[in-house]
Amino acid sequence: MDEPIISIRDLTVSYGGRRVLNGVNLDIMRGEVMVLLGASGSGKSTMLRHMIGLAKPDSGTVSIQGVDINNCSERELMAIRRDLGVAFQGSALFSSMSVEENIRLPLRELTSLSDSVIEIITFIKLAFVGLAEAGKLMPQELSGGMKKRAAVARATALDPEILIFDEPSAGLDPIVAAELDELILFLKRVLHMTVVIVTHEMVSAFRVADRLAMLYKGSLIAVESKESFSTSTDPRIRQFLDRKPQRITESETVQRRMRELVTMRGVSE
């Protein structure tokens, strides 16, 4: 049986006494596209931060290629991070650098390659995402879709085995989002990358995913194929798929807040 390229075990995280992730277990297999779904506040971003080693959990482990990233040497962690390409929400391009300078940065900082080789790799990466003519432009001169593509070029500069996207379709119109989805599938097919996508955009999720995992209030409630996920009868999943708002109960807290609002507006009950 294939070993997972990323293995998360009993991951528990709290902030300010509030439990954000509650004993999450997840295996991501080599070469698959795993989409992590969940409403705002479900723990998606927290899980991503721990997956790439930007924070340490209260308990539990995150292993990449068999190495526990919270219990390894600095040298091992650096090697692991070189195998991780991350395209953050909002692209996170350096505004003071041209597009090609953004792509060159990890190559110059993390390799001993010559300038001429770096130039060739930079051009190849930009051409790969359809930005061969945009290298001299500044990030502020790019459209939203072009910024996302430039972020992908930078994330793949070191030829990582794992590519992680944080809300890749955020802020994009449907046509540009579909083009980005096609690029993600192209990366998987041609470069045989393992892709992890954190999103709440269902159209893109079902377009690219091999499997989907769903977080609900800090707990992982489903890890399923697209087909199984779309036909799930779990009410929490159905609510998310059908875009139905949560029903507000008539609790004492809600009633008290309503009375406060009425008083503030000077309206008698």
Language model features with spans:
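Helix-to-loop junction immediately C-terminal to a conserved catalytic motif
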Residues: 52
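Catalytic Walker B motif of ABC-type/P-loop ATPase nucleotide-binding domains
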Residues: 163-166
